[in-house]
Amino acid sequence: RNEIMFRFKNEQTTVNVAGVRFGGQPGELPTVLCGTIFYQGHRIVEDDERGIFDRAAAERLVLRQSELSSETGCPFVLHIYARTVPALRKYLDFAEEVWSGPFIVDSAERSTRSLALSLLSELGYADKAIYNSISIATDDAEARALLENEVDSAIILAYNPGEPGVEGAMRILEN
């Protein structure tokens, strides 16, 4: 058996979001599957402004991801993409009915992401939600929204468009 030695500056910790554990030492926990639904151009979405979608097809996708999770032993997180807050509300209502685990909330629209935080708290989903993402593009208003709401899990996107690669990512994290 080949052993790979990892050395970390900081202690590796785990987090638990709605029963799914993330992090820790490499190999300590299984990889988490994150399947995206309702993304731009997704064939099941009929109107991405209003959140109209083919419910039966969406249910099949969530069921299939659940099956893959059982087959592989890897837990899964539902990654919900929404262009608008009204669409997100409909997608969250759907997710609450068909899925009991954690979900990632995502949008290319900064205002939708910020308003989503209030919506998640209002609907009581904050403890199941993972915000996507804190990045170099996060402005003060979005950061304030993160601090003022109950969602306490987020993805940090350490991408540096001015300096792609590990060194650039490290500079983003350090600054």
Predicted segments, located by residue:
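N-terminal amphipathic alpha-helix/helix-capping segment at the start of soluble metabolic enzymes
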Residues: 2-63
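N-terminal active-site wall of soluble small-molecule enzyme domains
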Residues: 63-70, 76-124
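Solvent-exposed alpha-helices and their adjacent loops that cap or buttress functional pockets
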Residues: 23-25, 96-97, 122-124, 146-148
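Active-site beta-loop-alpha junctions enriched in small/polar residues
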Residues: 36-39, 81-85, 108-110, 134-136, ...
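Conserved anion-binding
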Residues: 124-128, 134-175
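Gly-rich Lys/Arg/Thr-decorated short loops/hinges at beta-loop-alpha junctions or inter-strand turns
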Residues: 36-50, 70-76, 95-98, 156-157
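Well-ordered, non-membrane alpha-helical segments in soluble/globular domains
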Residues: 51-66, 88-92, 166-175
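Structural preference for beta-strand elements that scaffold enzyme active sites
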Residues: 28-33, 73-79, 102-104, 126-130, ...
